Amino acid sequence: MNYKTRIIIGVVIALIAVVSYFMKTDENPVTGEKQKVSLTVDEEIALGLQSAPEMIAEFGGEYPDKKLQAYVDRVGNKLVQSTEAGSSPYKFEFHLLADANTVNAFALPGGQIFITYALLSRLKSEDQLAGILGHEIGHVINRHSAEHIAKQELTQGLIQATDIASGDPGMISRFVGNMVNMKYGRDDELESDDYGVKYMVQAGYKPEAMIDVMRILKEASGGGNQPEFMSTHPSADNRIEKLKEVIAKYKKKQ
């Protein structure tokens, strides 16, 4: 295949990928926002339920102390029932994972939310736990996973196009992938911080605890944050400053 043919095929594949991405638009059932997503709400829920057992196994299973699991459930359900999340189509379930070494919390599409014992054991208050769970609920409500899947499909299409058209596909493919996905991660974390604070306030928790959570996470990472521009997540210090602004915003609305 000569160079001109490769370029033409690459352009066609890229155009198909871009057009397909921009045609995947749906209205968020909670926020009303128009979003580019690949999954319906029902598909999000099904994917989350299907993937949950694998995630549980990956982090050492469920934590055996049922009282601690009940504590996580109580805080999570209070957040859901006190906010718009309770009237959303998502069925939230909260999982305490047995992993005592990995400090982590995350959400799968459709309402499956996880926190490791390693993270829970570092928290000093119910308000801090509410901050973490509220943040993860924010990811679900804003359909970040569904948006991410749509962007991955776009990225894969562009990668295929550059692989065909470029003489150095590896470098260009990685560049395309990084540029498409970098802003997505940064924006979503800040948006979920915002929603986490809002849900904390609505459920009667102290939103300042989110700042304490950021400091705990920073300490757990050894303070070794990557330079913010090259990270998919804002730095802990940047998030703390943004959180102060968000907390002030929602306190004014009380």
Model-flagged regions — what are they?
Residues 1-254:
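A Zn2+-metalloprotease active-site environment signal
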